[in-house]
Design a protein with these regions (language model features):
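C-terminal regulatory
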Residues: 29-110, 115-140, 157, 161-190
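Residue-level signal for short, function-critical loop segments
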Residues: 50, 149-151
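Intrinsically disordered, low-complexity regions enriched in Ser/Pro/Gly/Gln/His and often acidic
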Residues: 140, 151-152
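Central regulatory/effector-binding core of bacterial HTH transcription factors
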Residues: 1-30, 178-182, 187-188
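Short, structured helix-loop boundary elements
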Residues: 4, 153-156
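A short beta-strand structural signal in non-transmembrane regions
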Residues: 143-147
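Short alpha-helical
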Residues: 8-9, 21, 100, 119, ...
C-alpha cells in the first residue's frame, strides 16, 4: 500500500504505524522511534505568474507580501503539530491539497509561494512564472528515508535497498521537472 502525505503527515503515518517506510521532506519529530537517513536535497524558488503584480518587483519583504495571497500545500498531519514552510503568520493564505494544485494556481496568478525548482523550471524557462527574490530565504530541503527499527522484514529490506539506489533521488528530480509540461497541458502527471 502506498500513501501520499505532505509535510509532517508522512512522519505521523510512520509513527502511527500506517506505513512501514517513508520518503519525507524535513526532519522528523523529536522523540524518535525511527531511523532516518538523508537521501538528497531539493532547492525551492519563490515564484509568481509573469502577470502577477509582484513579478516585476525587486527584493520582496513582509510588507509587500502582506498585500497579496500566499498559496501553500496543506500539512496532512492529523495529530502532530502542522508544519508550515515559507509562510509569514497572519497572511492571506490559500491552502491547497497538493503541489500540482499549487503550481496551477500560481501559474494562473492567484498567489505566490515557494515551489520546488525542478517543478517550476519549465514555467520559468517559458516565461509563465518569474522567480522573485525575497528577504526571507528558504533553505534547501533535505529529504529522508525513514523506518521503525526492529521491524525489518524482507519486503522492507528490499524497499530500503531500492530507495537508496545511487542516482534515484536525482532521477526523481528529473521526473519532477518533466511533470511541468503535463501539468501545464492540463494532463495528469505520471
Amino acid at each position: 500500500r502506498v500513501l501520499s502525505e505532505s509535510l509532517s503527515g508522512g512522519w505521523e503515518a510512520l509513527l502511527d504505524r500506517r506505513v512501514d517506510l517513508i520518503v519525507a521532506a524535513g526532519e522528523g519529530p523529536s522523540g524518535g522511534g525511527y531511523v532516518a537517513e538523508p537521501i538528497g536535497t531539493l532547492r525551492f524558488v519563490f515564484a509568481v505568474a509573469s502577470t502577477h503584480p509582484l513579478a516585476s518587483a525587486g527584493v520582496l519583504g513582509a510588507a509587500e507580501l502582506a498585500e497579496h495571497r500566499a498559496i501553500a500545500v496543506a500539512d496532512s498531519a492529523r495529530r502532530l503539530l502542522p508544519r508550515t514552510v515559507g509562510l509569514l503568520s497572519g497572511r492571506d493564505v490559500l491552502t491547497v491539497p497538493d503541489m500540482r494544485t499549487k503550481l496551477l494556481l500560481q501559474l494562473a496568478g492567484a498567489g505566490y509561494g515557494f515551489l520546488p525548482e525542478p517543478y517550476a523550471r519549465g514555467a520559468l524557462q517559458d516565461g509563465r512564472l518569474r522567480e522573485v527574490q525575497v528577504e526571507t530565504h528558504k533553505p534547501d530541503e533535505t529529504f529522508y528515508l525513514a523506518w521503525r527499527p526492529g521491524e525489518e522484514g524482507e519486503a522492507l529490506g528490499w524497499w530500503r535497498r531500492a530507495l537508496r539506489s545511487e542516482g534515484l533521488f536525482d532521477s526523481w528530480l528529473h521526473a519532477l521537472a518533466a511533470t511541468y509540461r503535463s501539468v501545464a497541458a492540463g494532463q495528469s502527471p505520471r
